[in-house]
């Protein structure tokens, strides 16, 4: 994880400079820029991917900034009207450097090694619409196009888990009757249609099954689905390499490995808005654990969370990691009984920011430098305000 995002004067963002890690948490009130940050990150990761697969050339976006970079690319997440005259955006990874400034957009290709392609999923806060609608929605009038993408993946996930899926809380099980196109939620002694279930279940189910579904696809290492055009191009490039008598076997192998990396997903980038939506704190904790388990499925997976809730914390998973790594066999066993290693978070792989409306730089890290966990003092401002008003 070596991606960096610098943004100035864009929508609600005044000035940020963020280096992303394996787990990234953005906490703050409405309108502080949490979603804006992760939408930009999603946009640039997708742009990297489309350039690597040569679906589009760099010139396609750099020569027509307003129509293609702003309206087409940024418009996917409905952030195309966030630009100002003094907007500056920089995104940099091992593979590309993207810079927007003065209504120009530049793309610089770097010499980083391609190890595969990311499977990127943006999980919107509006996901409850999918559960309450039940029938597959073909249009999302008034909502970003990203909702339509998530809708399609949600239905693929339902087919994958139609024989049953256990939610991470409440002893609840999900079943999908594909013949009649009906989703069911089963408790210990009851069964209701998903459209009649609680808002918490309607919000949580799409997150759970889509995350599990895509995480399993990436972890399996299978080739990703390709269009006929992509497949033909890959076959043509493979034949060209194999038929070139001027290349040594070692060079051919290296070039073929490079081509192969374009046909496989090596990581799942899971971007989830408000995982705590309509959930009780204990259920929020179970949801976070599931997302972290999926994120730990492969080394290069990434998890980005936006949240309003101080309950959406990762400290227990960090502390469990630290105790497990330092402990003897007996300590490891006791820690694993409380928090199994599949949920653990390495503090070196975590970043967390609090965003506010005030100040030129309206963000700050809430990680303690000494402990590596999220500082309670930075997140307890609401409690202090309530107590001050009460007193």
Show where each model-derived region lies.
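Loop/turn-to-beta-strand initiation segments
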Residues: 266-267, 299-304
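Conserved hydrophobic alpha-helix in the ABC-type ATPase nucleotide-binding domain
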Residues: 286-291
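P-loop NTPase switch/coupling surface
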Residues: 1-178, 258-259, 297-300, 312-313, ...
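Walker B motif beta-strand of ABC-family P-loop ATPases
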Residues: 269-271
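Conserved D-loop-proximal element of ABC-family nucleotide-binding domains
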Residues: 280-281
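H-loop/switch region of ABC-family ATPase nucleotide-binding domains
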Residues: 306-308
């Amino acid at each position: 994880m070596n991606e960096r995002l610098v943004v100035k004067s864009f929508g609600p963002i005044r000035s940020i400079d963020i280096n992303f890690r394996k787990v990234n948490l953005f906490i703050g009130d409405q309108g502080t820029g949490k979603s804006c940050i992760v939408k930009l990150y999603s946009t640039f990761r997708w742009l990297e991917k489309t350039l690597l697969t040569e679906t589009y050339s760099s010139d396609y976006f750099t020569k027509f900034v307003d129509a293609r970079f702003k309206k087409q690319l940024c418009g996917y997440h409905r952030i195309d009207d966030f630009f100002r005259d003094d907007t500056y955006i920089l995104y940099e990874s091992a593979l590309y450097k993207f810079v927007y400034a003065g209504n120009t957009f530049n793309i610089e290709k770097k010499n980083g090694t391609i190890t595969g392609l990311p499977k990127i999923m943006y999980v919107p806060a509006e996901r409850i619409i999918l559960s309450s609608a039940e029938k597959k929605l073909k249009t999302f009038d008034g909502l970003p196009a990203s909702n339509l993408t998530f809708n399609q993946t949600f239905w693929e996930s339902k087919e994958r888990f139609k024989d049953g899926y256990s939610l991470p809380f409440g002893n609840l099980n999900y079943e999908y009757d594909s013949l009649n196109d009906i989703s069911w939620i089963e408790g210990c002694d009851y069964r209701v249609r998903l459209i009649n279930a609680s808002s918490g279940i309607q919000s949580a189910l799409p997150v759970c099954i889509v995350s599990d579904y895509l995480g399993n696809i990436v972890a399996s290492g299978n080739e990703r689905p390709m269009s006929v055009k992509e497949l033909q191009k890959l076959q043509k490039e493979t034949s060209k390499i194999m038929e070139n008598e001027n290349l040594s076997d070692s060079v051919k192998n290296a070039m073929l490995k490079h081509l192969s990396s374009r046909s496989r997903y090596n990581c799942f980038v899971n971007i989830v808005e408000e995982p705590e939506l309509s959930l009780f704190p204990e259920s929020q904790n179970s949801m976070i654990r599931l997302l972290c388990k999926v994120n730990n499925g492969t080394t290069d997976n990434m998890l980005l969370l936006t949240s309003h809730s101080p309950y959406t914390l990762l400290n227990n998973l960090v502390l469990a990691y630290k105790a497990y790594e330092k402990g003897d066999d007996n300590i490891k066993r006791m820690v694993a009984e409380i928090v199994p290693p599949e949920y653990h978070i390495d503090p070196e792989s975590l970043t967390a920011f609090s965003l506010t409306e005030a100040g030129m730089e309206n963000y700050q890290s809430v990680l303690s430098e000494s402990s590596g966990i999220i500082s309670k003092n930075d997140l307890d401002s609401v409690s202090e305000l309530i107590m001050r008003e009460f007193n």
